Amino acid sequence: MKSFLVIGLGRFGTSLACELCALGHEVMAVDLREERVQEVAGSVTHAAAGDARDPEVLRALGARNFDCAVVSAGDDVGTSALIVLNLKELGVPQVVGKARSAVHHRVLEKIGADRVVFPEQETRKANQMVRGVVSLPHG
């Protein structure tokens, strides 16, 4: 069993946190919005509301004690970059960042993300591939 800190509870973060917990891993889910935290609280090991841009919040959550942190917070480069940077400076062994563009990807890599994912782009590619293979009747 590994321990994961999932920051940002949009569609991707919520889905990931719930899936990791279902697989038997320890999951701490964090979001700035209390309502998102409440929605996922019953499906993960721990859930907390807090501003992950603040290193003191990350320290209080025990961020450095997790095996991996996944940053899916913020649609802008600055927010996710700051969170990734804070996590790396706190000593989190593996930090995964979610990017929305090639530039976002480069920024997260440059500041130390161990891995960067493009969930929206990967979903779009999968949908295009499926549409090319499956012809749905019009009607």
Identify the function of each model-found stretch.
Residues 1-139:
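Cytosolic regulatory regions of ion transport systems
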